[in-house]
Amino acid sequence: MSEIKLKYFGTDGVRGIANETLTPELAFRLGRTGGAILTRHAESDKKPVVIVGRDTRISGDMLQQAMIAGFLSVGIDVLRLGVITTPAVAFLVQNLEADAGVQITASHNPAADNGIKFFGKDGFKLSDELEYEIEQLLDSPEDTLPRPSANGLGVASNYPEGALKYMSFLQKTIPTDLSGMQVALDGANGATSDLLPRLFADLNADFVTMGTEPNGLNINDGVGSTHPEALADLVKSSEVQAGLAFDGDGDRLIAVDENGDIVDGDKIMYITGKFMNEQGRLKHSTVVSTVMSNIGFYKALAAHDMTSVKTAVGDRYVMAEMIKSGYNLGGEQSGHIIFRDWATTGDGLLTALQLLYVMKETGQKLSELAADVQVYPQKLVNIAVADKVAIQKNPAVLAKIAEVEAEMAGDGRVLVRPSGTESLLRVMAEAPTTELVEKYVEAIAAVVRDQANVS
């Protein structure tokens, strides 16, 4: 199958506005179809088991109930993990030897959105081929899946022990505790809200928290990895060594140094990658990144005898490259960092522990560790368009991109790509000065708006 066009699945599962485009009816059908596809190779002498987690969105309970009903209706038992992070679900699928896992989350998106992420029994996100199979069943004019009765039905039960197993795993990924470390923690009012104080207390760190009081509506609202400004203020006022901001489902991390400056995914990958390389643990001395990583990141790697392989945007593509070529560190500027030695997906809490471990082992401040990455000014503009793919291929837009790249003469770059989850075209540029990057982005964005007939 050369190119798979998916109707429901985007780059990170099924997303939509809860109860509008992502309805409980759709969640129920996804439970039936996804459950049937993912458990078809389960042992025949016992019922398949699927684990289900969610973030703190008010719609999470509604969608979880519907999804679970779908699983139960095809004879699958369900373990409810409750509010938990996405990487915890990926870990627990393997740890509990479940047949599949599901997380109800829209990650860093606003509270009105929600989504459904599937994991196979190996803890990895699904391939395009598997998602296509699920979609074919979803759109089938007739539901031919089994409808067992009586003891053939699945049974759902709570499994609060999952969080404890996950935290125990995390603590074993560093060979020391965090005594003597002072940090500020921002849980984005999301899935890490309850885990953060428990985990860092267990590791003997001194910490202050924010964004750990979810009410179902305040997830990612002015807090978390997409809004680290408030955390930066807390870091400075509390005089701690670092700030750690997570997103709504806990699969990404953005850090803040002791001065309140942002340490993004590029810098985190560089810091941890350099440390791993010096210890002989960075496979092939290579970090896998996406096309969104900054030029300064690549220059810092090269200066310290490391290289990088680029992929399309999305941690699933980073992971695919890591598996294919045997790399063990990769991620995105946005803070999805994958430590393949321990995990099958990006994990904000795991990343936080690795970063703090480097700080503790080296005795260096976070600002000192990040200083090697001299970031080129970068600007990203999101433009709402009706057809993001068509506009990306528009001749006038392509001509303007070529014109800008010629003017850059190699000292800068342009990236124009459609969003994987929203009806947006993203226009990004990097250049030596802020003035130049503003000029380049606005030149391209103006043509995009003109061709898309948007103001």
Swiss-Prot record:
One function term, GO molecular function aspect: phosphoglucosamine mutase activity
Q: Which cofactor does it need?
A: Mg(2+)
| InterPro entries associated with the record | A-D-PHexomutase_a/b/a-I, A-D-PHexomutase_a/b/a-I/II/III, A-D-PHexomutase_a/b/a-II, A-D-PHexomutase_a/b/a-III, A-D-PHexomutase_C, A-D-PHexomutase_C_sf, A-D-PHexomutase_CS, Alpha-D-phosphohexomutase_SF
Give the reactions, separated by semicolons, that this protein catalyses. Answer: alpha-D-glucosamine 1-phosphate = D-glucosamine 6-phosphate
What keyword terms does UniProt attach to this protein? Answer: Isomerase, Magnesium, Metal-binding, Phosphoprotein
Key word Isomerase present in the record? yes
Enzyme class, top EC level, equals: isomerase
Instruction: Give the annotated active site.
Output: 107
Cofactor stoichiometry and binding remark:
Binds 1 Mg(2+) ion per subunit.
List residues, modification Phosphoserine. 107
Q: Name one GO cellular component term.
A: cytosol
Highest taxon above the source species? Bacteria
Q: What Pfam families does this protein map onto?
A: PGM_PMM_I (PF02878), PGM_PMM_II (PF02879), PGM_PMM_III (PF02880), PGM_PMM_IV (PF00408)
Task: Give the E.C. number(s).
Answer: 5.4.2.10
- Residues that bind Mg(2+), according to the entry? 107, 247, 249, 251
Description of post-translational modifications: Activated by phosphorylation.
Which processes are annotated in GO (biological process)?
Answer: carbohydrate metabolic process; peptidoglycan biosynthetic process; UDP-N-acetylglucosamine biosynthetic process
The similarity comment for this entry is: Belongs to the phosphohexose mutase family.
Question: What is the recorded function of this protein according to its Swiss-Prot or TrEMBL entry?
Answer: Catalyzes the conversion of glucosamine-6-phosphate to glucosamine-1-phosphate.
The name of this protein is Phosphoglucosamine mutase
